[in-house]
């Protein structure tokens, strides 16, 4: 008899507080990660936090660094070369989504742990197992492994432009439609469904909706509210063993925009707008979702995304092709141009 086995990989430590740059070494020692570390950062995040963390780590570890500018397979390969040549035991990603995604995928391919040290709170990739990597000109979502620890310094994240925090709210409200799509796939395709993971995902969304006015204040408490929701959402995906609890048709819409729009907006911003439309298609209270995004100052239409309405329509019609195996409210054949235009107009997206 074949027995069902479900693997859940979760962060072993989550540290949320102030002035945590010197705590990375303590976490690494506690988790017995090893002596050789590769720290990844971008030009900006090196100055914001990376340089100070690196200096402190050198007191206890052998440290190598890699400066990266985008989440690409080329940069993943660069990291893998350093890991092999320098016998790296663990990685540290200091930055936003791109840096953490490269660290995440490189650690997975090399089978070494990594610590996530986010400098923005713009999406739930800071704690999830999935990496969004650009390869051959297009961004693709790749299953990897979650961080062994997440260290979120409120003081650092607070200094990022508020736009990133609002984008984090957009990524969180998308859990509402993602779970609906997951339930749909479970009923129609018999896909595995975890009630626990779905509940945790929905709780993350409800948390930011409830605290929208506090989040808009853009202070330490705002950051804490969003970060807790993002981490909970990432854990929900780890429990599910897939991105299903937090990624549905609204994410496919965002990925489609990434592929066709000359200047895409932030991931969370696009997902938030996509959620308004997908909530309408699901028969959910899309007006409440739109109101939440307005309350936190996130985009709710094409003009605020600074994307031509034509690309919104096109993205809606091709979204179902981004991941054909992922069943959503868009169905197997997707939306017609007429249906896409109607949904976007009714919801005020165009």
Curated annotation (Swiss-Prot):
Pathway the protein acts in: Membrane lipid metabolism; glycerophospholipid metabolism
Cofactor(s) it depends on: Zn(2+)
GO biological process, one term: phospholipid biosynthetic process
Record-level GO cellular component terms: cytoplasm
Positions annotated to bind Zn(2+): 171, 251, 267
Known function: Catalyzes the NAD(P)H-dependent reduction of dihydroxyacetonephosphate (DHAP or glycerone phosphate) to glycerol 1-phosphate (G1P). The G1P thus generated is used as the glycerophosphate backbone of phospholipids in the cellular membranes of Archaea.
Reaction catalysed by this enzyme: sn-glycerol 1-phosphate + NAD(+) = dihydroxyacetone phosphate + NADH + H(+); sn-glycerol 1-phosphate + NADP(+) = dihydroxyacetone phosphate + NADPH + H(+)
GO molecular function, one term: metal ion binding
Cofactor remark: Binds 1 zinc ion per subunit.
Protein residues bound to NAD(+): 97-101, 119-122, 128
Pfam families referenced in this protein's UniProt entry, alphabetically: Fe-ADH_2
Protein location: Cytoplasm
Keywords, in A-Z order: Cytoplasm, Lipid biosynthesis, Lipid metabolism, Metal-binding, NAD, NADP, Oxidoreductase, Phospholipid biosynthesis, Phospholipid metabolism, Zinc
Family: Belongs to the glycerol-1-phosphate dehydrogenase family.
Disulfide bond entries: none
HAMAP family named in the record: G1P_dehydrogenase_A
Entry EC number(s): 1.1.1.261
Gene3D superfamilies for the chain: 3.40.50.1970, Dehydroquinate synthase-like - alpha domain
Chain positions recorded as substrate binding sites: 124, 171, 255
Name the UniProt record assigns to this protein: Glycerol-1-phosphate dehydrogenase [NAD(P)+]
């Amino acid at each position: 008899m074949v027995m069902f086995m479900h693997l859940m990989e979760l962060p072993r430590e989550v540290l949320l507080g102030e002035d945590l740059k010197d705590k990375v070494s303590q976490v690494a020692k506690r988790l017995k990660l090893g002596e050789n570390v590769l720290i990844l950062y971008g030009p900006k995040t090196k100055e914001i936090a990376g340089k100070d963390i690196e200096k402190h780590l050198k007191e206890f570890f052998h440290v190598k660094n890699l400066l990266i500018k985008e989440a690409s397979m080329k940069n993943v390969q660069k990291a893998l070369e350093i890991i092999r040549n320098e016998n790296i035991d663990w990685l540290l990603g200091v930055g936003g989504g791109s840096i953490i995604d490269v660290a995440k995928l490189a650690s997975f391919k090399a089978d070494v742990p990594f610590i996530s040290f986010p400098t923005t709170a713009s999406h739930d990739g800071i704690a999830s197992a999935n990496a969004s990597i650009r390869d051959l000109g297009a961004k693709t979502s790749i299953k990897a492994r979650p961080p062994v620890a997440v260290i979120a310094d409120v003081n650092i994240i607070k200094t990022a432009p508020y736009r990133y925090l609002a984008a984090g709210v957009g990524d969180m409200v998308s859990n509402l439609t993602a779970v609906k799509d997951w339930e749909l796939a479970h009923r129609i395709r018999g896909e595995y469904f975890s009630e626990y993971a779905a509940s945790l995902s929905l709780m993350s969304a409800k948390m930011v909706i409830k605290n929208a006015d506090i989040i808009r204040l853009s202070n330490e408490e705002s950051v804490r509210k969003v970060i807790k929701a993002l981490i909970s959402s990432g854990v929900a995906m780890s429990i599910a063993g897939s991105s299903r609890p937090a990624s549905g048709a609204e994410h496919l819409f965002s990925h489609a925009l990434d592929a066709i729009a000359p200047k895409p907006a932030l991931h969370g911003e696009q997902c938030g707008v996509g959620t308004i439309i997908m909530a309408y298609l699901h028969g959910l209270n899309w007006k409440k979702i739109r109101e939440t995004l307005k309350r936190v100052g996130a985009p709710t239409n094409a003009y605020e995304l600074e994307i031509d309405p034509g690309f919104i329509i096109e993205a809606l019609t091709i979204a179902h092709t981004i991941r054909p195996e992922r069943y959503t409210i868009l169905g197997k054949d997707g939306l017609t141009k007429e249906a896409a235009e109607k949904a976007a107009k009714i919801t005020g997206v165009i």
